[in-house]
Every structure is written in C-alpha cells, then in structure tokens.
Amino acid sequence: MEKIPMTPDGLARLEAELKSLKSVDRPAVIRAISEARDHGDLSENAEYHAARERQSFIEGRIKELEDVTSRAEVIDISKLSGDTVRFGATVSVLDEDSEEQTTYQIVGAHEADLKAGRISVASPIGKALIGKKVGDSIEVKAPGGSKFYEVTMVRFG
C-alpha cells in the first residue's frame, strides 16, 4: 500500500470533508431518497433518481477519502528547512517571458489547489521544481509550448 505524502493541513481538510459527508450529506440523501419513494412510482420519479445518483457520488467520495486518509504520510513542514525545493516548500518563480512573479507551495496531489497557490509535487511545474535552488531555471512543457521560470525564493514553514 503506497503512502501518500501530505501536509497536516491537507490531512485535516480531507478528514473534515469525510466527517461532513458521513454526518451531514449521507443522512440528508437517505432522507431525500425516503421522501422521493413516498411519491410513488420509482420508474418515473426524477427526485428519486437524482437522490440515488447523489448517494452514489457521496458513497464513492467517502470510500476515496477513507483510502487516502488511511495511506496519508503526514510531513510536518514546520520542521523542514534548507535551500532546495522539495515537498512542503514554498517557492517563488519568475516567468522569464512575462516577468510575472508567482508563489506556490509544493503539496501532495490530494491537497493541490491552484487558486490557493498549492501545486502537486506530481504536476509538471512541481516535478520541474523539485531539487532546484534560488537562481536555478526550469523549463515546463505546456500545451502552448515551453515556459521558462527562474526560482527566486525557497522557504519552509
């Protein structure tokens, strides 16, 4: 069983989602199915079919989250240090074409959220950054062509 690297915050978010699915969403969908059944003929009951579909999604997500959280390898990034990019690092890069500066935290795939500045260690830019230091340049192959970035900051915690 392969371990999944994760930050403490990432694990906490997944556990909170799992708890909500089990204690709020699952009971609500069971009630919705019961109410829809009371409306009679199930073959033409859109409410019933929608509730069953939602139940299927919820149960699938619960199974996925139980699997991921059971295999989580929590890495306390507050105890990490150094000048080399690795899991947990917060990294600033400068787009060598646009001169635009962007900051990312390198996290596990299940906690990545680009809008929040968290990118997966397995993403193209995440892979390119691993092992790099301030001043290093990286090339990231994108659908529109290669992009080049310079690492301008690496920090932990």
UniProtKB/Swiss-Prot annotation:
Source taxonomy? Bacteria, Pseudomonadati, Pseudomonadota, Alphaproteobacteria, Rhodospirillales
Q: Which domain of life is it from?
A: Bacteria
Q: Name one GO biological process term.
A: DNA-templated transcription elongation
Coiled-coil stretches are 46-67
The protein's GO terms of the molecular function aspect are:
DNA binding; RNA polymerase binding
Its source organism is Rhodospirillum rubrum (strain ATCC 11170 / ATH 1.1.1 / DSM 467 / LMG 4362 / NCIMB 8255 / S1)
* Entry-linked PANTHER family: TRANSCRIPTION ELONGATION FACTOR GREA (PTHR30437:SF4)
Give yes or no: UniProt keyword DNA-binding.
yes
Concerning its family, UniProt says:
Belongs to the GreA/GreB family.
Q: What does this protein do?
A: Necessary for efficient RNA polymerase transcription elongation past template-encoded arresting sites. The arresting sites in DNA have the property of trapping a certain fraction of elongating RNA polymerases that pass through, resulting in locked ternary complexes. Cleavage of the nascent transcript by cleavage factors such as GreA or GreB allows the resumption of elongation from the new 3'terminus. GreA releases sequences of 2 to 3 nucleotides.
Quick one: which gene encodes this?
A: greA
**Would the keyword Transport be found if you checked this record's keyword annotation?**
no
The alphabetized UniProt keywords are: Coiled coil, DNA-binding, Transcription, Transcription regulation
Q: What is this protein called?
A: Transcription elongation factor GreA
Do you know which Pfam families this protein is assigned to?
GreA_GreB, GreA_GreB_N
Q: Show the disulfide pairing.
A: none
HAMAP family linked: GreA_GreB
